[in-house]
């Protein structure tokens, strides 16, 4: 590597580290720090770590583009589209890398969902329900849109051997253990993780075939059944588990790990660029 390129890389690394310090400063659980902002910090890190590669960030993908990708796999796929300008827009956007053939390939897709304010309400002494006489609010269905986005990205990446979709869950509807919360008047309210009223994790684990959560499932799983081989594209689902907010530095580290796994999975298609001295 030339001295000029080395200098540029060090400058980029410094810029990236400044960004990390800025976003993960005093309040790592700030409501203002979105998964989209974290994605852009991940992008900066990747650009610094792999200066030979070209990356880009997109906020959305058009349904038309997804259909065109499907048609390349099989002409019978991707035929139906009623709204020409429809698109999907994951919370954290899409990071892509340009491969040795000049094609853009997905490195990371991230989303974060908060559902269930029972912990916050109990701590504040707020009662809920029609008559404002209940401690717990029945879980809603706000996370259903995640299923659509996961399916659309799975279609878009049907020809790939990796699926870097990461979904961060927080709030009382995604508990992994029973917790006890004390109200201002001293009364203790127990939130049971296996309550059908509260927990909505099972509605999302269909997107990873019931495999473990809080696990990097970026590399596709190939299973054999009788004479058939089936490829599984599983979302990597991470739940905070105690009804609290995610630490953004933790999110960043998970997203970076999944991005690196994607690049490793595409290694042979990036080899020429990675081994160049530009």
Predicted regions and their residues:
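N-terminal, Lys/Arg-enriched amphipathic/low-complexity engagement segments
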Residues: 25-32, 36-68
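Short loop/turn segments at strand-loop or loop-helix junctions that form parts
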Residues: 110-117, 167-171
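Active-site metal-binding core of divalent-cation-utilizing nuclease and nuclease-like domains
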Residues: 59-104
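Conserved catalytic cores of phosphodiester-cleaving nucleases, focusing on short active-site segments
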Residues: 92-94, 106-114, 146
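Secondary-structure boundary elements
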Residues: 48-52, 98-102, 154-161
């Amino acid at each position: 590597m030339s001295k000029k390129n080395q200098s540029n890389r060090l400058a980029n690394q410094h810029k990236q580290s400044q960004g990390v310090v800025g976003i993960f400063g005093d309040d790592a659980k700030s409501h203002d720090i979105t998964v989209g902002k974290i994605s852009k910090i991940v992008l900066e890190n990747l650009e610094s770590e792999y200066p030979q590669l070209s990356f880009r960030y997109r906020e959305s993908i058009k349904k038309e583009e997804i259909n065109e990708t499907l048609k390349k796999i099989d002409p019978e796929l991707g035929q139906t589209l009623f709204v020409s300008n429809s698109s999907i827009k994951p919370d954290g956007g899409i990071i892509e890398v340009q491969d040795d053939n000049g094609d853009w390939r997905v490195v990371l897709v991230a989303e974060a969902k908060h559902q269930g304010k029972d912990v916050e309400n109990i701590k504040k002494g707020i009662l809920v329900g029609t008559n404002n006489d209940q401690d717990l609010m029945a879980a809603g269905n706000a996370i259903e849109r995640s299923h659509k986005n996961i399916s659309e990205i799975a279609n878009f990446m049907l020809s790939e051997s990796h699926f870097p979709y990461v979904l961060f869950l927080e709030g009382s509807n995604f508990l992994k253990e029973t917790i006890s919360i004390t109200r201002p008047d001293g009364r203790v309210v127990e939130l049971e993780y296996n309550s059908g009223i509260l927990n909505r994790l099972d509605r999302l684990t269909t997107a990873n075939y019931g495999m473990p959560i809080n696990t990097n499932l970026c590399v596709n799983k190939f299973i054999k059944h009788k004479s058939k081989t089936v490829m599984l594209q599983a979302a990597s689902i991470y739940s905070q588990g105690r009804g609290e907010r995610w630490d953004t530095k933790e999110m960043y580290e998970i997203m970076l790990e999944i991005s690196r796994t994607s690049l490793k999975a595409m290694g042979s298609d990036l080899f020429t660029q990675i081994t160049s001295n530009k």
